[in-house]
Amino acid sequence: MNKERFLRLLNERILILDGGMGTMIQSFKLNEQDYRGERFADFPGQLKGNNDLLCITRPDVIQSIHRQYLDAGADIFATNTFNANAISMADYAMEAYVREINLAAGRLSREVADTYMAEHPDRTIFVAGSIGPTNKTASMSPDVSDPAYRAVTYKDLYNAYKEQVEGLVDGGVDIILFETTFDTLNVKAGLEAAEVVLKEKEKDLPIMLSLTLSAQGGRTFSGQTLLAFLASIQHTHIVSVGLNCSFGAADMKPYLQELAKYAPYYISAYPNAGLPNSFGTYDETPDKMAQHVKPFVEEGLVNIIGGCCGTTPAHISRYPELVKGAKPHIPALKPDCLWLSGLELLEVKPENNFVNVGERCNVAGSRKFLRLIKEGSYEEALTIARSKWRMAPK
């Protein structure tokens, strides 16, 4: 399916994305043997819970789930590859099978999509290659006693993402989907890897990006505001940006409004089925969720709508009627000024006049700082650095 057709449809109507994969896998009540199959019968360690492996050992289950979402009205469905990267697969000592899993996932999804479109000539279906954030962060230390330590490097992430994207593209996906992004540095490595792979393979696939926010303050888990995040990825070639996971649809609207106002991209939203209960499951009914999603559609905030944790084909089945005849979101214009990002956005406009970034912590630019360093007065020098940090745009 070509990129031009996808973009044309985004301008014409609101597209429907599928719902939760893990939720549906749980409904099959699979055991350890299901995850192992004959191929991995003697593989050391427990494999139950490695859902991505089911693309090899129980492809029938994964294809059944994909078809259920298509029957519910989904225009786009994601491959079962959220954790299919070498970094995450290390938990199961299955790094060597990453390419095979992604290739199998792409191929079985391609088969489902092509078969379904042959059976339903009036439907256009897109396969999105799902790429999760990995289980490590490049921006923060997992050790509070060693804040400079990083459990993963940018190069590690780039290599892991590159291998995954290669498998998905070779498997026949239509879209590259980075989802549940919580660390900007992680996804920047992924976006770079994706663009390199697509260039090497001479493919022009659309790239979608979806992030997750903290319920407290609406920031990414690495601390950025939405606008700072947009500034951080403005150099990339994504076609859409959006929100998924995080919380339920009831709490997502103000952040979608901010994206819709400022993001020069198409907008996606696929919230959880409410918030998890004390047992870790989700109780929001399909009708209740549709009620919360309705304003996204009516106010022109989205181009793509779907579901994340706790959602099922029953939830997605409410969307076709909801989006029928609705006008899709029109992307905002690109910023007319310089956008810089830290934890918050810095807009550099003519009316800002001169923006003084600071030279007080430079031995070549500050005699006082030079003297303190020469004298070994590091605590006083650190005080200057702290004052600059407090005054700086975050």
Where are these regions (language model features)?
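Domain-level signal for soluble alpha/beta catalytic cores
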Residues: M1-K394
